[in-house]
């Protein structure tokens, strides 16, 4: 990207972290040890795909509350030849799942997924068929260069040696201590003596290290047809879960073509349904393109108002039109059409917040992780993966160290809707592993955790970079806003005068200490260097690679 040009700002802020700069590779993840794992693989001769997979496995150790091999997600890959592919390894509903399997408690905005006894949140009945391990191994087999056993070594070592607990991890354990205490394995691992692990304590995961070694020897078959899979299905059968051996054997990843849109001279590329990000980020950018956003000033009343209205429009359409395309006909062409954006934009009122309904016919948890990796050959990976809620279903499969997802929470527990449960149906997601091109060359790649707040936050980072001319570090750390049609959340750095002006326009404003999770990103500069950035909302750390080998023919003499 070109150097940022200063533009007016109403909401001012100071970045808490510093970017990294490199020329031969960049790894940015939400934990420094995972970034180091990816960098280690790049230095060993691996490419960006090898490094991304190594980082993801390391994150299953260092961020056990966020991601695991029993989870799912999306990996957006740009290959050195310019091809883009999205690997969909999202979890699926078990074959025994039904649309009526949970007792619903509410249909209010924000409470639609509430069920009796939180059965779609904690426990065996909340677990969907995992896709993470198969997806990561498939990415490595198709596009990587190193064997799985080598790529797994950093994670195995991390699990065996242990690592120092960060305040962020300790806080996550504390926040979920009640649910964790109900599972013997997680209680022993995370609540020694009945108390949460504290910052500075060491977390060792011996059982999980053994599971990773088994995967290194047997590949994904260790889970989808072997010992680890039997441990999972035995636990499910004994505890009211639905996953069986047939579910594991029948699970398939999907290779998908990304959604492509345009915004002020950039090509914006993101994942297609069942992710909502590619479609609805494109839709919202099409709406915003009709305004001179940059001249309004970052964080101004008008700029925030337009973001809020665009978000409400997208969420209204998303609720009725976007789901697993194998089960629901998704009107992608209509949603990303600039003419449709013109129709929706014409209904926006600058001085009045509106309630929006869908313009056509037709819930997730915030606890996810993201990696962004680039190598010297031109391969780029933007991958978002999760076990869904904090520590997933708060279930550890005995003897394996594996933490199960609670992906069933992402379905609408009410029957007869686009997002209702059906056997084999892929979960719906807001994951937004995004990339942008300028004149055919990659300009930036980014992503973050945060559930329903993911794609709105990714949208804001794109607007920050293109309209507000922010640096990459500023774009990922800038204060965010969010709404799906109810309250309008404003992070604390948005000025109170702006909040009051938005209230006067009819917005239901609430303050939030944090909207979504820790974004990480890579910018590709005209001089061939890479800039990596991670934000204050997580333990994110960029690790850059520069330098290189000695000049050809160089000798050491004395």
UniProtKB/Swiss-Prot annotation:
Its EC number is 3.5.1.93, 2.3.2.2, 3.4.19.13. The active site is at residue 368. InterPro entries: GGT_bact, GGT_CS, GGT_lsub_C, GGT_peptidase, GGT_ssub, Ntn_hydrolases_N. Keywords: Acyltransferase, Antibiotic resistance, Hydrolase, Transferase, Zymogen. It comes from the Bacteria. It holds the Pfam family G_glu_transpept. GO terms for biological process: glutathione catabolic process; response to antibiotic. GO terms for molecular function: glutaryl-7-aminocephalosporanic-acid acylase activity; glutathione hydrolase activity; leukotriene C4 gamma-glutamyl transferase activity. It catalyses: (7R)-7-(4-carboxybutanamido)cephalosporanate + H2O = (7R)-7-aminocephalosporanate + glutarate; an N-terminal (5-L-glutamyl)-[peptide] + an alpha-amino acid = 5-L-glutamyl amino acid + an N-terminal L-alpha-aminoacyl-[peptide]; glutathione + H2O = L-cysteinylglycine + L-glutamate; an S-substituted glutathione + H2O = an S-substituted L-cysteinylglycine + L-glutamate. Dimer of two non-identical chains processed from the same precursor. Belongs to the gamma-glutamyltransferase family. This is Acylase ACY 1 proenzyme. It comes from Pseudomonas sp. (strain SE83). The lineage of its organism: Bacteria, Pseudomonadati, Pseudomonadota.
């Amino acid at each position: 990207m070109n150097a940022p040009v200063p533009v007016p700002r109403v909401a001012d802020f100071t970045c808490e972290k510093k970017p990294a700069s490199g020329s031969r590779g960049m790894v940015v993840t939400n934990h420094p040890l995972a970034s180091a794992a990816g960098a280690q693989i790049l230095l060993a001769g691996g490419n960006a795909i090898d490094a991304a997979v190594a980082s993801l496995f390391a994150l299953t150790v260092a961020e056990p509350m966020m991601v695991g091999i029993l989870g799912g997600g999306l990996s957006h890959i740009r290959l050195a030849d310019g091809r883009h592919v999205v690997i969909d390894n999202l979890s699926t509903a078990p074959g025994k799942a039904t649309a009526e399997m949970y007792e619903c408690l509410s249909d209010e905005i924000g409470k639609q997924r509430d069920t009796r006894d939180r059965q779609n949140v904690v426990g065996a009945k909340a677990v969907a068929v995992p896709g993470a391990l198969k997806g990561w191994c498939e990415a490595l087999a198709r596009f990587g260069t190193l064997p799985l056993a080598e790529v797994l070594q950093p994670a195995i070592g991390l699990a065996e040696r242990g690592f120092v607990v960060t305040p962020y991890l300790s806080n996550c354990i504390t926040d979920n201590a009640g649910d964790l205490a109900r599972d013997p394995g997680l209680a022993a691992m995370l609540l020694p003596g009945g108390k949460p692990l504290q910052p500075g304590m060491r977390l060792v995961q011996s059982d999980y290290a053994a599971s990773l070694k088994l995967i290194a020897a047997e590949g994904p078959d260790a889970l989808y047809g072997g010992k680890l899979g039997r441990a999972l299905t035995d636990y499910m059968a004994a505890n009211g879960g639905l996953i069986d051996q047939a579910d594991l054997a029948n699970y398939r990843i999907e290779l998908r073509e990304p959604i492509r849109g345009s915004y002020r001279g950039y090509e914006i590329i993101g994942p297609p349904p069942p992710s909502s990000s590619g479609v609805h980020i494109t839709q919202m950018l099409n709406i915003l393109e009709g305004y001179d956003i940059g001249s309004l000033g970052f964080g101004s009343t008008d700029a925030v108002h337009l973001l809020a209205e665009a978000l409400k429009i997208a969420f209204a359409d998303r609720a009725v039109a976007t789901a697993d395309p194998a089960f629901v006909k998704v009107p992608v062409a209509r949603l990303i059409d600039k003419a449709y954006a013109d129709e929706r934009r014409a209904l926006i009122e600058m001085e009045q917040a509106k309630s929006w309904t869908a313009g056509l016919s037709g819930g997730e948890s915030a606890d996810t992780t993201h990696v962004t990796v680039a190598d010297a050959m031109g391969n780029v990976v933007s991958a978002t993966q999760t076990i869904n809620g904090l520590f997933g279903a708060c279930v550890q499969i005995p003897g394996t160290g594996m933490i199960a997802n609670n992906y069933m929470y992402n379905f609408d527990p009410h029957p007869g809707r686009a997002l209702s449960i059906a056997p084999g149906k892929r979960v719906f997601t807001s994951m937004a592993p995004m990339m942008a091109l300028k004149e055919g060359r990659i300009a930036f790649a980014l992503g973050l955790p945060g559930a329903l707040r993911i794609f709105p936050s990714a949208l804001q980072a794109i607007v920050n970079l293109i309209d507000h001319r922010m640096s990459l570090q500023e774009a990922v750390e800038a204060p965010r806003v969010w709404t799906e049609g109810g309250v309008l959340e404003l992070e604390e750095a948005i000025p109170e005068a702006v909040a009051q002006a938005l209230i006067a326009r009819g917005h239901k404003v609430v303050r939030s200490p944090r909207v979504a999770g820790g974004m990480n990103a890579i910018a590709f500069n005209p001089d061939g260097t890479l800039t990596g950035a991670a934000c204050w909302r997580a333990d994110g750390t960029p690790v850059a690679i520069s330098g290189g080998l000695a000049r050809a023919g160089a000798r050491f003499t004395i």
